[in-house]
Amino acid sequence: MKNNAQLLMPREKMLKFGISALTDVELLALFLRTGTRGKDVLTLAKEMLENFGSLYGLLTSEYEQFSGVHGIGVAKFAQLKGIAELARRYYNVRMREKSPLLSPEMTREFLQSQLTGEEREIFMVIFLDSQHRVITHSRLFSGTLNHVEVHPREIIREAIKINASALILAHNHPSGCAEPSKADKLITERIIKSCQFMDLRVLDHIVIGRGEYVSFAERGWI
């Protein structure tokens, strides 16, 4: 009863002020629903965030880290992984609706939902039509912890097949640092030059790290 009573507080706050009014602790408590023996759900949520540093750190943790620190079992671990997967699928659906990309933030959030937590480098491309509406997105290449082999001709072949007019490139850095390497810059230049011959525009290349990102377009590199 104590857990349920304390959980009602963030619920009441949400109903009165909206979901965005909740703190990270309160939002996490809503999903956890119950605490553990001798620890109410708000206290548990606060301790979890303190141990992992942020929601990002918590949602990308492995089970061994999770249970080792908190000892609260596989059920709550599954709940949290479910939250992350739900967010990923939500953005996946939004990007399939053929609507124009509303903002750079929407694009970044989608890419973070797709690439965060991957243990290998993944190279993705978002294919757009002439109105910059999403046609599709695809994980075209996957590599190792710190390298992925990218072939511009494969990107162009896919773009021609689906009649794309513009592209957004993206890949992740499993190390966590989003700063582009020299190799990242070189492959971007190669892709841009190859696309120019086919009248394809590369709008951006976004590198996703751990809780951070770098946009080539924002830095003026594209």
UniProtKB/Swiss-Prot annotation:
InterPro entries registered for this protein in UniProt: MPN, RadC_JAB, RuvA_2-like, UPF0758, UPF0758_CS, UPF0758_N, UPF0758_YicR
A single MF term (Gene Ontology): metallopeptidase activity
Gene Ontology biological process: proteolysis
Keyword check for Protease: yes
Matches recorded under Pfam families: RadC, UPF0758_N
Domain MPN as annotated: residue spans: 100-222
Keywords attached to this entry: Hydrolase, Metal-binding, Metalloprotease, Protease, Zinc
Residues annotated as binding Zn(2+): H171, H173, D184
Family listed: Belongs to the UPF0758 family. YicR subfamily.
PANTHER family tied to this protein: DNA REPAIR PROTEIN RADC, UPF0758 PROTEIN YEES-RELATED
NCBIfam families: PRK00024.1, radc
Protein's name according to its UniProt entry: UPF0758 protein YicR
Lineage of the species this protein comes from: Bacteria, Pseudomonadati, Pseudomonadota, Gammaproteobacteria, Enterobacterales
